[in-house]
Amino acid sequence: MDLIKHYINGEDIEGGSRQGDVYNPAIGEVISKVTLGDLELVNNAIESSKKVLEKWRYTTPAKRASIMFNYKKLLEDNSARIAEMVSKEHGKTIEDAKGSLQRGIEVVEYACGIPNLLKGEYSNQVGSGIDTFSMKQELGICAGITPFNFPVMIPLWMFPLATACGNAFILKPSERDPSSSIELVRLFEEAGAPPGLVNVVNGDKEVVDALIEHREVPVSYTHLRAHETD
């Protein structure tokens, strides 16, 4: 049976002592196993991203935009294959999976305009002898915790814009359908992104807690309102 591993620094990593089942909902059978990460693996992924970030944050917006254009083309060229991966692990129809992927690609297209989006502002004489200006700077390492129901759309809402703005990214997809999310990152590297800029850590609550509690990592996630007070 296939084992779905973490994807860190451009490599498949098996880290973590536990595994979970990945089902094909159409037949109700386990089709693969997924490695579940732990605190140590999360910290290793963050350290990997730190090393890449030191160079990436100084990469010009024009160069980042070039990678985004390449990435958009790769996503479009591989849309049928990605949709099949989503359908196999999630249960969406192929057409529904293609539709959700397209909504993600639209965000990548928006990220292609990052040189213009990152422009600051300057105002003359806002007060007597006072001029003001603003600069947009990266946050550093960001993380995204994404849900089962949209394994490609929501990751594409997160990491392309985050990296286009000069950040590195840790992606924690749902452990129930992780394959298509990992494939998004493989294609991102094929488009020209450096290995380790986006790392994928599979896992459950242990990984989620490690990311949320890490002081250096701002987290974006999709959740139920009740989770806000859990």
Language-model regions, residue ranges each:
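Glycine-rich loop-to-alpha-helix module at the N-terminal edge of alpha/beta enzyme cores
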Residues: G28-L118
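Terminal low-complexity tails and localization/encapsulation signals of metabolic enzymes
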Residues: M1-K33, S66, G120-T146
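Periplasmic-binding protein-like
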Residues: P160, P218-Y221
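Conserved small-residue-rich beta-alpha loop and adjacent elements
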Residues: E121-P195
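Glycine-/small-residue-rich active-site loops that bind phosphorylated ligands and cofactors
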Residues: L74, T93, F150-P151, R176-D177, ...
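A structured beta-alpha segment of the ubiquitous adenosine-cofactor-binding alpha/beta core
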Residues: D131-T132, V200-P218
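Single conserved hydrophobic/aromatic residue that forms the stacking wall/gate
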Residues: H223-D230
